[in-house]
């Protein structure tokens, strides 16, 4: 979704250099006090600074790759093609609005790309004379008629016609790039508003990082008279993606409200009058001991609908109003935790390029102060496809946990991706630091399990034999499960899962039942026939210290995605130490009471 075509055209364009379009930004980070002894002040402060030096796109002079990128994004999110000249959109049902040139199928294309413009295309027929005017993809039927060219009726010869692409590329791309289904936001907020959001947010896909640029980073402290002074300076060079990172230790300084300020100045500039710099005030200094909340963003605090696929993610990210992406009660829940002196940190697979949009979302959602955020850079479509989401997020989460000293951690995510799997690994690595794991159940909502009523199965004429295997809870009674008799020769084996809560258990305990049904044939020698008999294999796993605060499927479930979620939950419970609770929620109001008790207990100890 974000800029990656440079890898395919390496060397075709000059590397970006510092100019008037160059910008620099600093991302939210926090400092950690270290070396503190009982009854004394800390001796050192761990400084963490992260930023990006990049070049903004020149909207008046976009290259071919940039135009192609925007056009592909338009189709991907369901926007209709935009007219190059007028900025209007053609009607989808009227083919005449897209008609620009009609020629015979024997016409030949002469493409002229000397100026790098895709519209320098001339059409020449085999019967063209010297007096005939040149034809281009921007020649209208009226121009052709005025020059004596016979234009056939498009309704009679649509199969022999060329149409100008609304995306300004070619008729071939018009067939593959015109969205088959328009975005739902066109009908809800209007096409003009969708276009406004798209143009504002899609610019992030065209930003290019500037490598090997030198940045001067200054750390300011504020005294009692509100005067700032520089307490540390660092020179750092940007990496290949344009990012600069500082992880250093400085002597301890007393500052107003225990907050510093950070300024980043780009040392090289083509203009002496313009200094390219970024400034971030109120960078907090956290104690090495305390409680921090590390949360995912997509489908956890922001309704991105990752579970519905990348096309839905692109549509929501680029077109949806920010007030429609909030999740009920989440900001209130986070404010409750910060009122208990917990700090908020975000680790997500969202790209750094989307930070301006995310910052606006957090402000609109009244999210409490963000102490630090860890995102990632999208540097190639191929890498994003091959590299699993868990691998992309694991390193950032590990960096965030290690940078927080000895602080206790509460992990918050969702089951739309692989958050629980990654959090289980972190809990196994830091069993004494993880207080709890909170997972938002978007899978049940997506699958519609709660809306479906389980039909009662009919009893079979034959006796159902139950055979247990791999039962992890011997005390759990085995249960019979039957299905309607169907075509025995064609019906395959079936698998069903069921979550059952054990009554009166502290902490809360669930039993995950697995039923595997299949049919065998038993010979009836008396009647000289073969009768089908259903076999049911049953296994049960005990899930201790699991708290499901939202609605869930209490019946036997055959949905594959829902079954995968149950398996992930059982596997995670086997990896995560039993003293760490796993809490399943959907709305932010549900885990508030549980979280208050958890944090108060942690602070008391």
Swiss-Prot record:
Residues 111-151 are annotated as: Disordered. It comes from the Eukaryota. InterPro entries: APP1, APP1_cat, Mg2+_PAP. It holds the Pfam family APP1_cat. The keyword Zinc does not apply. Keywords: Golgi apparatus. The keyword Iron-sulfur does not apply. It is found in: Golgi apparatus. One of its GO terms (molecular function) is phosphatidate phosphatase activity. GO terms for biological process: lipid metabolic process. GO terms for cellular component: actin cortical patch; Golgi apparatus. Its main location: Golgi. PANTHER family: PHOSPHATIDATE PHOSPHATASE APP1. This is Uncharacterized protein C29B5.04c. It comes from Schizosaccharomyces pombe (strain 972 / ATCC 24843) (Fission yeast).
């Amino acid at each position: 979704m974000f800029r990656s075509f440079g890898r395919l055209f390496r060397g075709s364009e000059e590397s970006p250099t510092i100019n008037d379009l160059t910008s620099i930004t600093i991302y939210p980070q926090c400092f950690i006090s270290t070396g503190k002894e009982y009854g004394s002040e800390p001796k050192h402060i761990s400084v963490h600074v992260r930023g990006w030096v990049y070049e903004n796109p020149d909207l008046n002079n976009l290259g071919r790759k940039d135009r192609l990128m925007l056009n592909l994004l338009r189709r991907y999110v369901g926007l209709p093609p935009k007219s190059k000249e007028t900025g209007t959109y053609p009607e989808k049902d009227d083919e005449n609005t897209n008609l620009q040139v009609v020629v015979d199928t024997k016409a030949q294309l002469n493409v002229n790309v000397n100026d790098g413009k895709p519209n320098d295309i001339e059409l020449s027929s085999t019967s063209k004379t010297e007096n005939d005017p040149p034809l281009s993809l921007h020649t209208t039927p009226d121009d052709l008629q005025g020059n004596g060219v016979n234009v056939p009726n498009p309704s009679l010869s649509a199969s022999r016609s060329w149409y100008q692409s609304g995306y300004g590329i070619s008729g071939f791309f018009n067939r593959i790039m015109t969205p088959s289904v328009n975005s739902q936001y066109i009908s809800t907020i209007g096409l003009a508003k969708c276009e406004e959001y798209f143009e504002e947010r899609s610019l992030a896909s065209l930003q290019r990082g500037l490598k090997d640029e030198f940045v001067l980073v200054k750390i300011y402290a504020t005294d009692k008279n509100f005067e700032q002074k520089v307490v540390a300076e660092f020179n750092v060079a940007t990496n290949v993606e344009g990012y600069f990172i500082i992880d250093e230790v400085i002597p301890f300084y007393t500052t107003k409200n225990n907050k510093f300020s950070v300024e980043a100045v780009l040392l090289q500039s083509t203009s002496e009058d313009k200094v390219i710099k970024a400034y971030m005030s109120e960078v907090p200094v956290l104690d090495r001991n305390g409680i921090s909340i590390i949360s995912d963003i997509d489908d956890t605090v922001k309704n991105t609908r990752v579970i519905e696929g990348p096309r839905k993610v692109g549509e929501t990210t680029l077109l949806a109003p920010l007030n429609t992406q909030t999740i009920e009660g989440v900001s209130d829940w986070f404010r409750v935790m910060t009122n208990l002196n917990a700090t908020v940190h975000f680790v997500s697979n969202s790209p750094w390029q989307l930070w301006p949009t995310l910052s606006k979302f957090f402000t609109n959602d009244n999210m409490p102060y963000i102490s630090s955020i860890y995102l990632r850079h999208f540097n190639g479509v191929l890498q994003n496809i091959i590299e699993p989401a868990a691998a992309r997020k694991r390193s950032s989460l590990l960096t965030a946990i290690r940078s927080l000293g000895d602080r206790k951690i509460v992990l918050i995510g969702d089951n739309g991706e692989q958050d629980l799997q990654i959090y289980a690994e972190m809990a196994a690595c830091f069993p004494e630091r993880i207080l709890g794991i909170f997972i938002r159940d978007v899978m049940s909502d997506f699958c519609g399990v709660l809306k479906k009523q389980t039909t009662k199965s009919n009893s079979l004429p034959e006796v159902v034999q139950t055979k247990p295997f791999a039962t992890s809870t011997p005390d759990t009674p085995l249960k019979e499960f039957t299905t309607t008799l169907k075509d025995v020769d064609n019906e395959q084996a079936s698998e069903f899962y069921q979550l059952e809560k054990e009554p009166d258990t502290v902490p809360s305990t669930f039993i995950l039942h697995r039923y595997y049904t299949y049919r065998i044939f038993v010979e009836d020698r008396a009647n000289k026939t073969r009768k089908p008999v259903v076999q049911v294999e049953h296994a049960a796993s005990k899930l201790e210290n699991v708290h499901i605060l939202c609605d869930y499927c209490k019946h036997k479930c055959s949905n594959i995605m829902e079954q995968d979620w149950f398996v992930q939950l059982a596997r995670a419970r086997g990896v995560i130490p039993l003293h760490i609770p796993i809490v399943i929620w959907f709305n932010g109001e549900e885990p508030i009471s549980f979280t208050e008790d958890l944090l108060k207990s942690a602070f008391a100890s």
